[in-house]
Amino acid sequence: MKKYLIMFVALLALVGQANAQRCLPKMKGIELKANMADGFHTSDKDNSAGYSFGAALSSYTKGGNKWVFGAEYLQWHSPYKDICIPVSQFTAEGGYYYKFLSDARKIVFFYIGASALAGYETVNWGDKLLFDGATLHARDRFVYGGAITLDMEIYIADRIALLANIRERCLWGGDTKKFHTQYGLGIKFIIN
């Protein structure tokens, strides 16, 4: 009887759900994101809000922190009379994100990160002459700066996570706005 009791207790110790090991050092993931910039983008001609799309490679370090390297396309609009003049930025990013909160089951993670950004800004796709004969004085230029990001990951499977983020970008060197607030959603695929 004692033998069966020990076996029963051993079996009970093995019952339960095993959680996946997430955010281990050297794990890598591919992130795809879509954001709104400076408000909510609509077709209204007085709306200067825009949107952005990005892709990044994230590599985890000790403690679940991560390095992020990626590229992003951001477009916003500058209202002028009855039209909106497009301003586009193509940027590369490199940054470090610190995990400051996660749940015990390692499903939800919160990060705060800082990134360096560099890229190119184009106003009206380089076309200086407007429909009414006015000339744009803003030029296409290289831009540089940084971003601060608050990021959330929610794992829906062992290798798939949903992302939500809010970030503030500041870029110098261009002839247009320096600061852009972005918020959006994304998805991450763990690749190793």
What are these regions (language model features)?
Residues 4-13:
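Sec-dependent N-terminal signal peptides
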Residues 76, 148-192:
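Predominantly the C-terminal beta-signal and adjacent terminal strand-loop region
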Residues 13-19:
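C-terminal segment of classical bacterial N-terminal signal peptides
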Residues 26-30, 47-53, 84-92, 108, ...:
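Residues that define the transmembrane beta-barrel architecture of outer-membrane proteins
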Residues 3, 16, 24-28, 63-65, ...:
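Short coil turns and loop connectors of transmembrane beta-barrels in diderm outer membranes
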Residues 20-70, 74, 188-192:
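Short glycine/proline- and aromatic-enriched beta-strand/turn motifs that initiate or cap beta-hairpins
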